[in-house]
Structure formats: structure tokens, C-alpha cells
Regions:
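Short, amphipathic alpha-helical interaction segments positioned at domain boundaries
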Residues: 283-312
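Short amphipathic alpha-helical interaction segments
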Residues: 250-266
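Minor-groove-contacting beta-hairpin "wing" of winged helix-turn-helix DNA-binding domains
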Residues: 277-281
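A generic structural signal for well-ordered alpha-helical surface patches
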Residues: 230, 241, 260-263, 289
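Generic non-transmembrane alpha-helical segments
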Residues: 56, 131, 261-264, 268
Length: 312
């Protein structure tokens, strides 16, 4: 929810509808940063929404933060983290800002000179990780943190953590019905995406059609690679025998190319390779996305340069 448009009455209404989890968009509490991104959202406004959620019985509250925003630096973001810790959300997502003005018109108002450089962004990220993990949050991986008592942390310790388009989850193999512009549904081995444009989305609904304009059905290789990638992202460890038995392959033969790509990670002690398993080391957890990407065949075959999920 957006605290700027969600008052206490709306929070109560959402809970009465049966919702029990809430994610708050914050980005940054610094006034200068908020002005630079045209999102004025005072701390007290977010605090009021969180208090209303607690009072109405929401079981879990997540807070989304973004680093790499204009006017942001280590000092300003440290204060934002202080305020986040004061509010004590159950989960925190710390995303990297992707500056893509050619794709997103509102970003064209942002001056490149106002953006922190790569070194500053990396320092902001590491500062935040240190502060959060020192204050009772577990680094789940892939930008996400949760309190040690949260079910995400418990699931990761037990090896039952899952991941979907919305992030990490404790619900294994659940289908996901997505509503809204550009959202993606997952049903079994099938994926379906809604239109990007609001006009196209509502036109389909008015005409009584499904608001879906494209889809994809996974093949056997896709399903195997999805399992490998998700296991690495969720557990930081992959047992070769589990893959062999589940998909009827010999891991070292099927993934010989990918294992070769692990050599630089092993050299820098980010990954540990054993005869029976692959393990992402403690200091390699921050790079788990990069490790998992090597098992994505489509990404390897693609010539496009990515820009959405880089670390810095």
C-alpha cells in the first residue's frame, strides 16, 4: 500500500476483506530525496499507517526501501535506517534503484548528477546490511530481510523457503493469480502476463476477456533450471543428488558449462564446490543473484544487457 493514500479507515477495510499481510512503499525518509523523486511521504504518515495495520491485526508488515536514489548518500540513508528500525517492520526489502529514463518518463526529471556513484551505492547497501543484521534481522537474500522470529527466517533455517515474483514465500508450489497492469500469474508450469498499459488492461476487462496478452509454458529443461535457481536463491546451497533424482539427470554432465562459470566465484571464496553440492559462502550471499543467473539458459542466450537487478 501507499501510505500517502491509505488512511486508517482504508487499512481497516483491507483487513475486513480478509487481507492479513501488508507491504508499505517507503523508498527513503529523507525530505530532499523524497522531493527529488517527487514522492513526499513524511515519516509520521508511514508510522500512522503501520500503527493502523498493527491495531487491525495484520500479521506481517513489510517495508520497501530503495538505495541509489538522487540526493541519497551514506549519511542520509543511515538516518532512514534508524527510522525504519524505530518502526520495526517484520520484513524489509532493500532494492537497488534502476535509472532507466528511456523506459520510465518520470525518471527524466532526475538529474544524473544527483545520483550517487557506484562506490557510494555499494557502501550504502553494505551499511544497511550491517545495521539491519545487527538489529535482529536475518539477511534472507536477494534484497530481503526478516526478523529472526518471522516465518521467512524460520523457513530458511528449515530449508523450506520458496521464491516467486513477489519475493520470498513459505508457501510451496502455490499458484498465483495476478491482478493489475503488467502483473504476472503462475499456474503450475504456465505463466501469463497482463498488458503494460492501463488502457489495454481495462479494455480487455470491459470486453469480458481475460486481461492477459501473453504467456509461456515451461518445458522440462525450464522446470529443472527453475528448481536449481530457486534452490540456490532460497537456501544458498544445492545438493546435486536432489536434482539428479528429481529430474533423472547427472548434474555434473548436464551443468558442466555452468559449473565452469563458478570458477571465479570459487577463486574469490564466494562459492564452495564439492563433489555432492554447491554452497554459496557467507560473503557470497550478497552475490547469490549473479551465481544463480549462470543457470538461466535464456539469459545466457540473450544478447540484451540487463538493467533492472544489478547490485550497483
Amino acid at each position: 500500500v501507499d501510505p500517502r493514500t491509505c488512511d486508517a479507515d482504508k487499512v481497516k477495510h483491507l483487513h475486513d476483506l480478509g487481507l492479513n499481510r501488508m507491504s508499505l512503499g517507503v523508498q527513503d525518509f529523507n525530505p530532499d530525496v523524497q522531493k527529488a523523486v517527487n514522492r513526499i511521504q513524511p515519516f509520521e504518515m508511514t508510522k500512522a499507517t503501520m500503527e493502523a495495520a498493527r491495531e487491525n491485526g495484520f500479521e506481517s508488515i513489510n517495508m520497501d526501501l530503495i538505495y541509489g536514489l538522487p540526493k541519497q548518500n551514506r549519511g542520509t540513508f543511515e538516518k532512514t535506517i534508524d527510522q525504519v528500525l524505530e518502526l520495526s517492520p517484520d520484513r524489509i526489502a532493500l532494492y537497488h534503484y534502476a535509472h532507466l529514463p528511456n523506459h520510465f518518463k518520470p525518471q527524466r526529471r532526475i538529474l544524473p548528477a544527483d545520483l550517487p556513484d557506484t562506490v557510494e551505492k555499494v557502501n550504502i547497501m553494505f551499511d544497511a546490511i550491517k545495521r539491519l543484521t545487527a538489529n535482529g534481522y536475518r539477511y534472507i537474500g536477494m534484497d530481503h530481510f526478516a526478523k529472526e522470529t518471522d516465518e521467512l527466517s524460520v523457513a530458511q533455517k528449515e530449508g523450506s523457503l520458496q521464491r516467486n515474483f513477489q519475493g520470498y514465500s513459505t508457501k510451496a508450489e502455490c499458484d498465483m493469480i495476478a491482478l493489475g497492469v503488467s502483473s504476472i500469474s503462475k499456474i503450475g508450469s504456465a505463466y501469463a502476463c497482463n498488458p503494460r498499459e492501463l488502457e489495454d488492461y481495462y479494455a480487455a476487462i470491459r470486453e469480458g476477456r481475460l486481461a492477459t496478452n501473453r504467456g509461456y509454458l515451461l518445458n522440462a529443461d525450464d522446470e529443472m533450471r527453475r528448481y536449481v535457481i530457486m534452490t540456490i536463491m532460497c537456501n544458498f546451497e544445492l545438493r546435486k543428488r536432489d536434482v539428479d533424482e528429481r529430474f533423472g539427470i547427472k548434474f555434473d554432465e548436464t551443468f558442466a558449462y555452468e559449473l565452469g562459470k563458478m570458477k571465479p566465484y570459487v577463486k574469490h571464496e564466494l562459492v564452495e564446490l564439492y563433489d555432492d553440492r554447491l554452497v554459496v559462502s557467507a560473503k557470497g550471499k550478497i552475490f547469490v543473484r549473479a551465481v544463480a543467473m549462470h543457470f538461466d539458459r535464456y539469459l545466457r542466450e540473450s544478447t540484451r544487457a540487463g538493467g533492472y537487478s544489478r547490485i550497483a
